[in-house]
Amino acid sequence: MNKKKKPFLGMPAPLGYVPGLGRGATGFTTRSDIGPARDANDPVDDRHAPPGKRTVGDQMKKNQAADDDDEDLNDTNYDEFNGYAGSLFSSGPYEKDDEEADAIYAALDKRMDERRKERREQREKEEIEKYRMERPKIQQQFSDLKRKLAEVTEEEWLSIPEVGDARNKRQRNPRYEKLTPVPDSFFAKHLQTGENHTSVDPRQTQFGGLNTPYPGGLNTPYPGGMTPGLMTPGTGELDMRKIGQARNTLMDMRLSQVSDSVSGQTVVDPKGYLTDLNSMIPTHGGDINDIKKARLLLKSVRETNPHHPPAWIASARLEEVTGKLQVARNLIMKGTEMCPKSEDVWLEAARLQPGDTAKAVVAQAVRHLPQFVRIYIRAAELETDIRAKKRVLRKALEHVPNSVRLWKAAVELEEPEDARIMLSRAVECCPTSVELWLALARLETYENARKVLNKARENIPTDRHIWITAAKLEEANGNTQMVEKIIDRAITSLRANGVEINREQWIQDAEECDRAGSVATCQAVMRAVIGIGIEEEDRKHTWMEDADSCVAHNALECARAIYAYALQVFPSKKSVWLRAAYFGKNHGTRESLEALLQRAVAHCPKAEVLWLMGAKSKWLTGDVPAARSILALAFQANPNSEEIWLAAVKLESENDEYERARRLLAKARSSAPTARVFMKSVKLEWVQDNIRAAQDLCEEALRHYEDFPKLWMMKGQIEEQKEMMEKAREAYNQGLKKCPHSTPLWLLLSRLEEKIGQLTRTRAILEKSRLKNPKNPGLWLESVRLEYRAGLKNIANTLMAKALQECPNSGILWSEAIFLEARPQRRTKSVDALKKCEHDPHVLLAVAKLFWSQRKITKAREWFHRTVKIDSDLGDAWAFFYKFELQHGTEERQEEVRKRCESAEPRHGELWCAVSEDIANWQKKIGDILRLVAGRIKNTF
């Protein structure tokens, strides 16, 4: 090492070092260092100046920043997250530590940027590829077409004509064409000038003229001159039919020429020409570029791994989709050579090949893969003769005797006796197949079937179907007492073998037994598994749900078994007895229902509804004394029951025992004086035309129950029937003072005033009623109808709009609004109504009537069915439905609607109640009321 060399040489100078400053030297410059002088207007060349000091503009900005001491620190320039928009320290000196801090921040930013760089670049690349895929360049769109230019020969290139100056000649020299229509007189004149000239103009004979001999002279008939054409006498009109025939003839000639051509490889069939054109349309919807990419990718996979079966299958299917079936066949056959042990490749090859070739392919596959079941199944499917199928399957069973699928396919082709023999062998080869054992048991006799099932249980002790089949076998042969034992033994045996008893699966098996007609088996299964896996407090609820589910699945015997078991567990539960009674009423016989009700009232004597159901069942069958005895027993169990009193009164009045009914009502008024008892007493006297007695009873009832609106309504209606309008008005007004929220009372009073002719008073009453009962759709509807009946349709529409604003979910208002619209707007209104009230029966009924008015019979019937299904208690829906069937249905449909209505027993509906509650119709049956209401309907909507 050189000791004379100073250690600081080659090192950077310390901060603030100025050369020569320590020895007192000062720097100086000469003119050669500065350069020549510049003019003030010359551009400043400060390229080598430090940033911020290069130009005059930079100096001005610096001076301005120095002069501008107060920054913009207003609230509008402040952000909670970023602070002020500008730097608070921009006017301060930029020192070394600031530079170091900026370098650290820059390094951090660079580091963070590098961490996300790969993911960001990948995302940007995917976005660019997606954009290029959605919006490819024109160059990319025509790239596949440009590749075909390589196939153009040099002669074809040279034969392309030069464009020359004609390229833009029309644009450079515009020529304005004038098109003038030819007058009709021109065509008429030339069509009529078809005469022959019989003389020669003398001017034509000068200079030798036409008579001068001329080689092939002009007198010689000119080719085409005398043929049909210009010399043919004109007819005055064009024959378009002949023009069409000529065009067809020309097309036939061209097709014939092509079909007779032998220069090409194919010959065109004229008859199938258009069909062939349609078949040439490609069936795939992918882009041609995507197909080419997929083809290249699959080719690469095949070359990289030629023993990969999915690559060959995918390649063949790609060619098949693109319409190149022969290429697909060639590829898949090459695949069978490269992958001879792949079952999927052989099956795909058999699928792509035509019939005979496919058989050969399958035969070759069997030689390579003699143990594969699907190949044998495919071979059997390719055979058309039953004997050939049997031969193939038997050959397959020689190689694969333990295949259940092959045995099943072979047995299906045999006759019953041969199938039984084959199944005997099948269960030996496949002893764990439940299906084969059960199939053999079905074909055997009773004794042999029992032996077969016993062997099946020995081989498969964990399957429930064998036990259930054994129970069904015993039931089918009359041994019903064994069914219960077999099912109980099955539960015990399965649990002993570690099988979990799945309650849902057993219930499904019971439903299948029910549908198959094995009633005892399904009931035994239900009794055995109904209580498994259920908490004690959830039993009742779960069992009722199970019963409903069975009814929905049409497994009625299963539901009956559930109710029977539930009644044994809960004998004192009224709700269970009621559910069972309703089930028996809908799905059982009258005798079973009455027996059930007798047991029910014995366990639940306080359940009034059970007594009433029993009495009604007897009454409907015409056994009035039995109904009376049931009600007498009900009185003993429920001495002061209003329902039983009224049921007894109805029974006597319906059978014309009016004195008995009066005595019963008198006893009821003394022992159980309720408002309904008084109301029935008044109505009985009213319908018997004992007006005075009815009025006295009504006054007595009102002294006890003045807040019961139906009594006031009956009082007013009796006065109205006697034409005592003032007294009727007074009765309604008194009733409204006591019952201001009774909508029927308001309606009766308003209709009374309208009947008298006091429209102004009617409007006032309805407005007052709406104030006392806001959001009441019935009152709004009556107000709208009042204006409509008065002929003020504009006011009616205005009121309807207000009503829908106050009651936007009212079905009766929407149904009325539909038919207030003009016919073209009704459909739109009905759509709005369905959006607001999708499941309201009034809206559904209005839609059905709308379809009816448009003569869309099928749709109208569908909507009527939907209406009565949603609300079977709406009598108006049944009446309109019955009227519809009277006009457009058969007698069977009419009878069906009537019977369904009688079973539903509707009680509500505006038109229905107007007829059913009329005093003149008090003894009418449901069917009679239905006919009366339907007779009043006029389909003028």
Curated annotation (Swiss-Prot):
A molecular function (GO) term: protein-macromolecule adaptor activity
UniProt subcellular location: Nucleus, Nucleoplasm; Nucleus speckle
SS bond partners: none
Swiss-Prot/TrEMBL HAT repeat ranges: 384-416, 418-444, 445-476, 554-586, 588-620, 622-654, 689-721, 723-755, 855-887
Residues bearing PTM Phosphothreonine: 180, 266, 275
Modified residues (Phosphoserine): 143, 279
Subunit structure: Identified in the spliceosome B complex. Identified in the spliceosome C complex. Associates with the U5 snRNP particle. Component of the U4/U6-U5 tri-snRNP complex composed of the U4, U6 and U5 snRNAs and at least PRPF3, PRPF4, PRPF6, PRPF8, PRPF31, SNRNP200, TXNL4A, SNRNP40, DDX23, CD2BP2, PPIH, SNU13, EFTUD2, SART1 and USP39, LSm proteins LSm2-8 and Sm proteins. Interacts with ARAF1. Interacts with AR and NR3C1, but not ESR1, independently of the presence of hormones. Interacts with USH1G.
One Gene Ontology cellular component: U2-type precatalytic spliceosome
Basic and acidic residues compositional bias, start-end: 39-65
Domain of life, source organism: Eukaryota
GO terms under biological process: mRNA splicing, via spliceosome; spliceosomal tri-snRNP complex assembly
Protein known as: Pre-mRNA-processing factor 6
Species, as recorded: Pongo abelii
Alphabetical list of SMART domains matching this protein: HAT (SM00386), TPR (SM00028)
